[in-house]
From Swiss-Prot:
The keyword Metal-binding applies. GO terms for cellular component: cytoplasm. A divalent metal cation 2 binds at residues 65, 221, 224. Signal peptide: none annotated. Homohexamer. It comes from Lactococcus lactis subsp. lactis (strain IL1403). Pfam families: DUF34_NIF3 (PF01784). This is GTP cyclohydrolase 1 type 2 homolog.
Length: 257
C-alpha cells in the first residue's frame, strides 16, 4: 500500500475541504508514492516525536498541528522548524496534517469532546466554518462541571472565568471548541450557552465574556491530545493491515506547579 492510498482512505472520513480557509492540511513532507510501513499518530511534531517515529520504524506521521504553518523560504537547518523538516526527509518519514478539518468533521474532535461531557441536542457553534459545538446537559452545579471537565480531559487544574467565584450556580447549556477558540465566544452567547469551554482565552477576552454574561472554562490547548486516540482508533477501523502507533511523548509546553 502506498502512502497516497492511505491518505485517500483517511480523507473519505475527514476531507481536506472541511479545513478553515488557509489552513495547511494534508501531506506536508514526503513522497505519496512511497510504500507505507507503519503510522504514528501525534498531536505535535517535535524533536521527541521524530525520535519516537525513528525508534518505531514508521514512515508516516499523522499530526493534528501542522509542521509547516507558513511557507518556508529556505531549508538550511538554521532554525528548529527547518531542522525538523530536514531530519524527517533524511529519515524517509512523511508527515500528514489533519488540523481544522478534524475539528469540523462529523465524528471528529469537537464531537468527541461533546460526548465526553455528556452533551445532548448537539449543534455546530460556528455555522460559517463549522468549528465548535453547543449542547445541553442536565442542570449541573458549576463545581461539579469543573470536576467533570478535569476528569474528562485528564487535567489536574483548569482556569475558571468568573468574577464572583460562585461554584453553586447551575449550568444547563455548554459551548465547546478545542484548541484556541477565544474569538468564537460571541457565537456561544448567540446560541445561549451558559458557559464556554476553550483553550488559550486571553485576559481581556475573559473580561468581555463576563461583561456579556458568559462564564468560561479554559482547560488549555493540550486537551487536543485526544486527537491521538480518536484518529488512531479510526485508522485501525479501516483494517488496511498497517500498524498504527499512538505517540507516548508529552508535547505540552506548560507544566503546572
Amino acid at each position: 500500500m502506498k502512502i497516497s492510498d492511505f491518505m485517500l482512505e483517511y480523507e473519505k472520513f475527514c476531507p481536506k475541504e472541511l479545513a478553515v480557509e488557509g489552513d495547511p492540511v494534508g501531506l506536508q513532507v514526503g513522497n505519496p508514492n512511497d510504500e507505507l510501513t507503519k503510522v504514528l499518530v501525534t498531536l505535535d511534531i517535535r524533536e521527541q516525536t521524530v525520535a519516537e517515529a525513528k525508534a518505531l520504524g514508521v514512515n508516516l506521521i499523522i499530526a493534528k498541528h501542522p509542521l509547516i504553518f507558513r511557507p518556508l523560504s529556505a531549508l538550511t537547518s538554521m532554525n528548529d522548524q527547518e531542522k525538523l523538516v530536514l531530519d524527517l526527509a533524511r529519515a524517509g518519514i512523511a508527515v500528514y496534517t489533519s488540523h481544522t478539518n478534524i475539528d469540523v468533521v462529523t465524528g471528529g474532535l469537537n464531537d468527541y469532546f461533546s460526548q465526553l461531557l455528556g452533551m445532548t441536542d448537539i449543534e455546530v457553534l460556528d455555522d460559517e466554518e463549522g468549528l465548535g459545538r453547543v449542547g445541553n446537559i442536565e442542570l449541573t452545579e458549576l463545581s461539579v462541571l469543573t470536576e467533570k471537565v478535569k476528569a474528562s480531559f485528564g487535567l489536574d487544574r483548569l482556569r475558571l472565568i468568573t468574577y464572583d467565584h460562585n461554584l453553586t450556580q447551575k449550568i444547563g447549556r455548554i459551548a465547546i471548541c478545542g484548541g484556541s477558540g477565544g474569538k468564537l465566544w460571541p457565537k456561544a452567547l448567540e446560541k445561549k450557552a451558559d458557559i464556554y469551554i476553550t483553550g488559550d482565552i486571553y485576559y481581556h477576552v475573559g473580561h468581555d465574556m463576563l461583561s456579556a454574561g458568559l462564564l468560561g472554562i479554559d482547560p488549555g490547548h493540550y486537551i487536543e491530545h485526544a486527537f491521538i486516540r480518536l484518529v488512531a482508533d479510526k485508522l485501525r477501523s479501516f483494517d488496511m493491515g498497517v500498524k498504527i502507533y499512538e505517540s507516548q511523548e508529552k508535547t505540552n509546553p506548560f507544566y503546572d506547579i
